[in-house]
From Swiss-Prot:
N-glycosylated. This is Meteorin-like protein. It comes from Mus musculus. Induction: Up-regulated during adipogenesis and obesity. Induced either in muscle after exercise or in adipose tissue upon cold exposure (at protein level). Expression is induced by Ppargc1a isoform 4. The gene is Metrnl. GO terms for molecular function: hormone activity. Keywords: Disulfide bond, Glycoprotein, Hormone, Secreted, Signal. It comes from the Eukaryota.
Length: 311
């Protein structure tokens, strides 16, 4: 029997996830049992009609007869909404243009009222918990390289699933757009000179200005930083708007993690970052005098990845 399972696994080209390493977190489903169900017809492929978003229910006859559903989405942005979750979903994300997996970054943001399932990053049978099923918690953006794996969504045991819906938005972006995602491994550390110089080239916004105020929002685990900008090098989605007094300045706000402990600071900064799910998120933000030093040094060495007007 064991040999037959492994032979079937090789033919299917897919292994079922194994348990994560030591640490807190709910256990994944029994791997051998669900592997057998998957290989013996317990999984189905669900293709979204618009290839960007998927909405399904665990109460349909087809879903109840299967432990695992495969969902295929081919788009740069969209959403997944799973009502009355039972069993598990494997969500396969791909862009609508050809691009190698190692050059793609995926960001997901759970719906605020999402509940009923845990969301894992899965690759070659290993699971890493991304989003725990905690009802009412604010959805934190999670980003990872597509090369690191795909999404495995596992329903958690519930006595009453009638009020449960698991859902999230997703975005796929090129690896260069994701260069500010060094914050995943060390979310509050300062950027290196190299990371700052690359952020200048790839960020959705690059502005020079001052911190006017900082508001901490514990229930969302974020800090909101209000900026007065005196030089707008680049922006998308109109994050910064002209000041009402027509003073040649722009006003706007960006967010960062509450755990970073951002406070109002004196002096001029260069702010960079990306817009995810309509929200401007802070990336690298060196003091402008420090940026001038590193930029001129790179310019002298001829290693600037791109140019910016320093005046």
């Amino acid at each position: 029997m064991r040999g037959a399972v492994w032979a079937a696994r090789r033919r299917a080209g897919q292994q079922w996830p194994r348990s994560p390493g030591p640490g807190p977190g709910p256990p994944p489903p029994p791997p051998l049992l669900l592997l057998l169900l998957l290989l013996l017809g317990g999984a189905s492929a669900q293709y979204s009609s618009d290839l960007c978003s998927w909405k399904g229910s665990g109460l349909t006859r087809e879903a109840r007869s299967k432990e695992v559903e495969q969902v295929y989405l081919r788009c740069s942005a969209g959403s997944v909404e799973w009502m009355y979750p039972t069993g598990a979903l494997i969500v396969n994300l791909r862009p609508n243009t050809f691009s190698p997996a190692q050059n793609l970054t995926v960001c997901i943001k759970p719906f605020r009222d999402s509940s009923g399932a845990n969301i894992y990053l899965e690759k070659t049978g290993e699971l890493r918990l991304l989003v725990r099923d905690i009802r009412g918690e604010p959805g934190q953006v999670q980003c990872f390289s597509l090369e690191q794996g795909g999404l495995f969504v596992e329903a958690t045991p519930q006595q009453d699933i009638s009020r449960r819906t698991t859902g999230f938005q997703y975005e796929l972006m090129s690896g260069q757009r994701g260069l500010d995602l060094h914050v995943l491994s060390a979310p509050c550390r300062p950027c290196s000179d190299t990371e700052v110089l690359l952020a200048i080239c790839t960020s959705d916004f690059v502005v020079r200005g001052f911190i006017e105020d900082v508001t901490h929002v514990p229930e969302q685990q974020v800090s909101v930083i209000y900026l007065r900008v005196n030089r707008l090098h680049r922006q998308k989605s109109r994050v910064f708007q002209p000041a009402p007094e027509d003073s040649g300045h722009w006003l706007g706000h960006v967010t960062t993690l509450l755990q970073c402990g951002v406070r109002p600071g004196h002096g001029e900064f260069l702010f960079t970052g990306h817009v995810h799910f309509g929200e401007a998120q802070l990336g690298c933000a060196p003091r402008f005098s420090d940026f001038q030093r590193m930029y001129r040094k790179a310019e002298e060495m001829g290693i600037n990845p791109c140019e910016i007007n320093m005046e």
